Amino acid sequence: MQTCLVVDDSSIVRKIARRILEGLDFQVIEAEDGVDALVVCKKAMPEAVLLDWNMPVMDGYHFLSHLRRMPGGETPRVVFCTTENGIEHISRALEGGANEYIMKPFDKEIIAAKFQEVGLIAVPV
């Protein structure tokens, strides 16, 4: 079973994402900011990260920068999931190492489609 780290300062968003991802057969680990997420990644690198941009302590962009420099940090597929919808944020995220970018609010279909695009879920035949 693949593991997805959900990084968001909102416990409600984490709970919704957990339900969706568990329904897609992912084991889910949660972190409420980038610092907590780095601790998780140092213990065991997940296959996927669903990442918010705006969080206290360390935001998603800075987490991504640290992640990509860690041993094994190039491996996880990172999907930003945020309210930041400007082209400058999207470009910055993708240039910084994100694999995909989705806007909140999200649903199962949106997450499944993006996870298929980055190779985390098989495309139905």
Protein language model annotation of sequence segments:
Residues 33-36, 59-65:
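Acidic catalytic/metal-coordinating carboxylates
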Residues 104:
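A Lys-centered signature of the CheY-like receiver
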Residues 15-23:
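Charged docking surfaces used in two-component/phosphorelay signaling
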Residues 25-32, 40:
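Short hydrophobic/Thr-rich beta-strand motif most characteristic of the beta2 strand and flanking loop
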Residues 55:
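Receiver (REC) domain active-site loop signature in two-component systems and cognate sites
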Residues 62, 85-100, 110-113:
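Alpha4 helix (beta4-alpha4-beta5 surface) of REC/receiver domains from two-component response regulators
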Residues 44-50:
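Active-site beta3 strand of CheY-like receiver
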